[in-house]
Protein backbone atom coordinates (compact mmCIF):
# COMPACT_ATOMS: atom_id res chain seq x y z
CA UNK A 1 0.00 0.00 0.00
CA UNK A 2 2.89 2.36 0.65
CA UNK A 3 4.04 2.08 -2.97
CA UNK A 4 0.50 2.67 -4.24
CA UNK A 5 0.21 5.77 -2.07
CA UNK A 6 3.63 7.02 -3.21
CA UNK A 7 2.52 6.56 -6.81
CA UNK A 8 -0.55 8.71 -6.19
CA UNK A 9 1.66 11.38 -4.61
CA UNK A 10 4.09 11.29 -7.53
CA UNK A 11 1.23 11.91 -9.96
CA UNK A 12 0.48 15.08 -8.03
CA UNK A 13 4.13 16.13 -7.98
CA UNK A 14 4.23 16.14 -11.77
CA UNK A 15 1.21 18.42 -11.97
CA UNK A 16 2.36 21.01 -9.46
CA UNK A 17 6.08 21.05 -10.28
CA UNK A 18 7.67 24.52 -10.17
CA UNK A 19 4.49 26.02 -8.73
CA UNK A 20 4.55 24.97 -5.10
CA UNK A 21 7.13 25.23 -2.33
CA UNK A 22 8.67 21.98 -1.11
CA UNK A 23 7.43 22.38 2.48
CA UNK A 24 3.86 22.98 1.31
CA UNK A 25 4.08 19.94 -0.96
CA UNK A 26 5.29 17.76 1.93
CA UNK A 27 2.33 18.91 4.04
CA UNK A 28 0.02 18.05 1.17
CA UNK A 29 1.60 14.60 0.75
CA UNK A 30 1.03 13.90 4.45
CA UNK A 31 -2.63 14.85 4.04
CA UNK A 32 -2.94 12.82 0.85
CA UNK A 33 -1.30 9.70 2.27
CA UNK A 34 -2.73 10.03 5.77
CA UNK A 35 -6.35 10.89 5.03
CA UNK A 36 -7.44 11.15 1.39
CA UNK A 37 -5.91 7.94 0.04
CA UNK A 38 -7.04 5.70 2.94
CA UNK A 39 -10.60 7.02 2.76
CA UNK A 40 -10.88 6.47 -0.98
CA UNK A 41 -9.14 3.11 -0.65
CA UNK A 42 -11.67 1.99 1.93
CA UNK A 43 -14.46 2.72 -0.52
CA UNK A 44 -13.17 0.00 -2.83
CA UNK A 45 -11.16 -2.37 -0.65
CA UNK A 46 -12.18 -4.07 2.57
CA UNK A 47 -15.93 -4.13 2.02
CA UNK A 48 -16.53 -0.47 1.22
CA UNK A 49 -19.63 0.75 -0.54
CA UNK A 50 -18.02 0.56 -4.00
CA UNK A 51 -17.05 -3.09 -3.51
CA UNK A 52 -20.57 -3.87 -2.32
CA UNK A 53 -21.89 -2.23 -5.50
CA UNK A 54 -19.79 -4.61 -7.62
CA UNK A 55 -16.86 -2.31 -8.39
CA UNK A 56 -13.72 -4.21 -9.41
CA UNK A 57 -10.38 -2.47 -9.06
CA UNK A 58 -7.76 -4.41 -11.02
CA UNK A 59 -4.51 -4.32 -9.00
CA UNK A 60 -5.47 -1.02 -7.36
CA UNK A 61 -5.11 1.01 -10.53
CA UNK A 62 -8.45 2.83 -10.31
CA UNK A 63 -7.94 4.04 -6.78
CA UNK A 64 -4.27 4.96 -7.24
CA UNK A 65 -4.74 6.88 -10.46
CA UNK A 66 -8.09 8.30 -9.38
CA UNK A 67 -6.70 9.72 -6.14
CA UNK A 68 -3.56 11.01 -7.85
CA UNK A 69 -5.40 12.43 -10.84
CA UNK A 70 -8.11 14.24 -8.89
CA UNK A 71 -5.59 15.62 -6.40
CA UNK A 72 -3.35 16.76 -9.27
CA UNK A 73 -6.25 18.46 -11.04
CA UNK A 74 -7.27 20.20 -7.81
CA UNK A 75 -3.72 21.40 -7.21
CA UNK A 76 -3.32 22.64 -10.78
CA UNK A 77 -6.60 24.56 -10.62
CA UNK A 78 -5.73 26.14 -7.26
CA UNK A 79 -2.16 27.07 -8.24
CA UNK A 80 -2.88 28.24 -11.78
CA UNK A 81 -0.34 28.51 -14.58
CA UNK A 82 3.41 28.67 -14.04
CA UNK A 83 4.93 32.12 -13.60
CA UNK A 84 6.10 33.45 -16.94
CA UNK A 85 3.95 31.06 -18.99
CA UNK A 86 1.61 33.82 -20.18
CA UNK A 87 2.37 37.47 -20.93
CA UNK A 88 0.14 40.36 -19.88
CA UNK A 89 -1.82 40.28 -23.14
CA UNK A 90 -2.59 36.55 -22.71
CA UNK A 91 -0.20 35.22 -25.33
CA UNK A 92 1.82 32.11 -24.52
CA UNK A 93 5.53 32.47 -23.82
CA UNK A 94 7.48 29.42 -24.99
CA UNK A 95 9.26 27.60 -22.17
CA UNK A 96 11.73 25.14 -23.70
CA UNK A 97 13.09 22.26 -21.66
CA UNK A 98 16.17 23.17 -19.67
CA UNK A 99 17.91 19.81 -19.24
CA UNK A 100 17.24 17.36 -22.06
CA UNK A 101 19.79 14.71 -20.96
CA UNK A 102 18.28 14.52 -17.47
CA UNK A 103 14.75 14.33 -18.90
CA UNK A 104 15.84 11.49 -21.19
CA UNK A 105 17.44 9.65 -18.27
CA UNK A 106 14.24 10.02 -16.25
CA UNK A 107 12.22 8.63 -19.14
CA UNK A 108 14.45 5.57 -19.42
CA UNK A 109 14.28 4.99 -15.67
CA UNK A 110 10.47 5.09 -15.78
CA UNK A 111 10.27 2.80 -18.81
CA UNK A 112 12.79 0.16 -17.84
CA UNK A 113 12.86 0.00 -14.02
What feature does the model see in each segment?
Residues 1-113:
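Hydrophobic alpha-helical transmembrane bundles of multi-pass membrane proteins
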Amino acid sequence: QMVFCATAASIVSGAVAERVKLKAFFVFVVLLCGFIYPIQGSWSWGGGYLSEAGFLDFAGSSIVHGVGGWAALTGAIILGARKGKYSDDGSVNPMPGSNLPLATLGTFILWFL
